């Protein structure tokens, strides 16, 4: 199975600008990518990392500055044909992902396997149907369910918090420190981020 990991390497994670500088956002993006690559390789697969700009990574990086929709739809068209082929796509900002969660994503035999994000996005999918295409705008998990059914594909979903947790906002950083011991968590700790508890709520504060 072909497995792609698209990543924005040019101006990544702009919604973290209130807590991270541009260089730090890039470094943190590389750390999250390292966690995803490690999980995929541990599950016995070779990830194809595709970035909008060069990035440091343990595996080769293909630079492609197209948007996410045209990139992934081109991968679908070139990989999934009437006779054979399967494509998995896993987003690069899933630092909680593990070998086991990747195996859960790849295990079902449905034409389309979807991993919803907590905010209504689609954090990962597997496609074996030649007519399925993606549109990541808005509540994409809802749209991808409908698209799969419209083309006559069988659909299943993987209920995994580790696949569902993408890191976009400052509040999301607590999830990394709470539930991961990988490269992204290490980077946050080395950068001075620590968990705090205020009024019964766990948050993150930077102390240096």
From Swiss-Prot:
* Keywords for the protein's UniProt record, in alphabetical order: GTP-binding, Nucleotide-binding, Nucleotidyltransferase, Transferase
Any idea which GO molecular function terms this record carries?
GTP binding; phospholactate guanylyltransferase activity
Keyword Endoplasmic reticulum annotated: no
Q: Quick one: which pathway?
A: Cofactor biosynthesis; coenzyme F420 biosynthesis
Q: Which GO terms describe its biological process?
A: F420-0 metabolic process
Query: Which Gene3D superfamilies does the UniProt entry name for this protein?
Result: 6.10.140.50, Spore Coat Polysaccharide Biosynthesis Protein SpsA, Chain A (3.90.550.10)
Reported EC number(s) for this entry are 2.7.7.68
Which reactions are catalysed by this chain? (2S)-2-phospholactate + GTP + H(+) = (2S)-lactyl-2-diphospho-5'-guanosine + diphosphate
Stored InterPro entries: CofC (IPR002835), Nucleotide-diphossugar_trans (IPR029044)
Pfam families assigned: CofC
Coiled coil (residue ranges): none
Does this UniProt record's set of keywords contain Repeat?
no
The record's note on quaternary structure and interaction partners says:
Homodimer.
Q: What does this protein do?
A: Guanylyltransferase that catalyzes the activation of (2S)-2-phospholactate (2-PL) as (2S)-lactyl-2-diphospho-5'-guanosine, via the condensation of 2-PL with GTP. It is involved in the biosynthesis of coenzyme F420, a hydride carrier cofactor.
User: Family assignment?
Assistant: Belongs to the CofC family.
Protein name as it appears in the record: 2-phospho-L-lactate guanylyltransferase
Species name: Haloarcula marismortui (strain ATCC 43049 / DSM 3752 / JCM 8966 / VKM B-1809)
Give the source lineage, highest ranks first: Archaea, Methanobacteriati, Methanobacteriota, Stenosarchaea group, Halobacteria
UniProt gene name? cofC
């Amino acid at each position: 199975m072909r497995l792609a990991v698209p990543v924005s390497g040019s101006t990544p994670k702009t919604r973290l600008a209130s807590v991270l500088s541009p260089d730090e956002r890039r470094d943190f993006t590389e750390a999250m990518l390292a966690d995803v690559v490690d999980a995929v390789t541990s599950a016995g697969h070779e990830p194809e990392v595709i970035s909008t700009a060069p990035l440091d990574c343990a595996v080769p990086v293909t630079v492609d500055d197209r948007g996410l929709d045209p990139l992934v739809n081109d991968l679908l068209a070139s990989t999934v044909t009437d006779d054979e082929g399967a494509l998995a796509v896993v987003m690069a900002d899933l630092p909680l992902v593990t070998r086991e969660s990747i195996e859960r994503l790849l295990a079902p035999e449905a034409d389309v396997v979807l991993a919803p994000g907590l905010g209504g996005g689609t954090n990962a999918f597997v496609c074996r149907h030649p007519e399925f295409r993606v549109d990541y705008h808005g509540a994409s998990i809802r749209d991808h369910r409908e698209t799969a059914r419209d083309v006559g594909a069988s659909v299943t979903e993987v209920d995994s918090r580790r696949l569902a947790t993408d890191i976009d906002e400052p509040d999301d950083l607590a999830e990394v420190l709470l539930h991961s011991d990988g490269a992204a968590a290490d980077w946050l700790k080395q950068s001075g981020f620590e968990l705090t508890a205020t009024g019964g709520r766990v948050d993150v504060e930077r102390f240096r």
